[in-house]
């Protein structure tokens, strides 16, 4: 009796989560990100484009040396975290490199903010990008 009640409770909870809009990735989000990345002109928009660049991408490197703004390690970590979370959401390796391009001042970074449901703090991230940017 107790096992049946627990099973029924789990089924009801899963069903309610499925109908409430709470969930992981959406097909709409994936297609929107793929469309955004495919419209990019840069060579790193291809899945293996980051391998053809002249410099290697160091996983531990927190900041982009091309960014001429304020150097704040915590600020770079915060911006980089958005790109890493976006990669974890879509599992496409080129998202991380494309998201970091131009000192995070690009459409992919903005799309990642939207897809990670950070639109309520987007102004804070925009000002952070301007601080580290060129």
Curated annotation (Swiss-Prot):
The modification Pyrrolidone carboxylic acid is found at residue 61. GO terms for molecular function: neuropeptide hormone activity. GO terms for cellular component: extracellular region. Produced by the medulla terminalis X-organ in the eyestalks and transported to the sinus gland where they are stored and released. Present also in the ventral nervous system. GO terms for biological process: circadian rhythm; glucose metabolic process; neuropeptide signaling pathway. Stereoinversion of L-Phe (form CHH-B-I) to D-Phe (form CHH-B-II). Disulfide bonds join 67-103, 83-99, 86-112. The modification Valine amide is found at residue 132. Pfam families: Crust_neurohorm. Residues 1-24 form the signal peptide. Keywords: Amidation, Carbohydrate metabolism, Cleavage on pair of basic residues, D-amino acid, Disulfide bond, Glucose metabolism, Hormone, Neuropeptide, Pyrrolidone carboxylic acid, Secreted, Signal. It is found in: Secreted. Its main location: secreted. The modification D-phenylalanine is found at residue 63. Belongs to the arthropod CHH/MIH/GIH/VIH hormone family. Hormone found in the sinus gland of isopods and decapods which controls the blood sugar level. Has a secretagogue action over the amylase released from the midgut gland. May act as a stress hormone and may be involved in the control of molting and reproduction. This is Crustacean hyperglycemic hormones isoform B.
């Amino acid at each position: 009796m107790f096992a049946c009640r627990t099973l029924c409770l789990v089924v009801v909870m899963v069903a309610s989560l499925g109908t409430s809009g709470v969930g992981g990735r959406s097909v709409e989000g994936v297609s929107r990100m793929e469309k955004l990345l495919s419209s990019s002109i840069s060579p790193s928009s291809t899945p293996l484009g980051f391998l053809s660049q002249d410099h290697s991408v160091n996983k531990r490197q927190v900041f982009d040396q091309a960014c001429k703004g304020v150097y704040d390690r915590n600020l770079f970590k915060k911006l980089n975290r958005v790109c890493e979370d976006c990669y974890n959401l879509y599992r496409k390796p080129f998202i991380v490199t494309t998201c970091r391009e131009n000192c995070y001042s690009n459409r992919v970074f903005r799309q990642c903010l939207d897809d990670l449901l950070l639109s309520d703090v987007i102004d804070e991230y925009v000002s952070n990008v301007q601080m580290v940017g060129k």
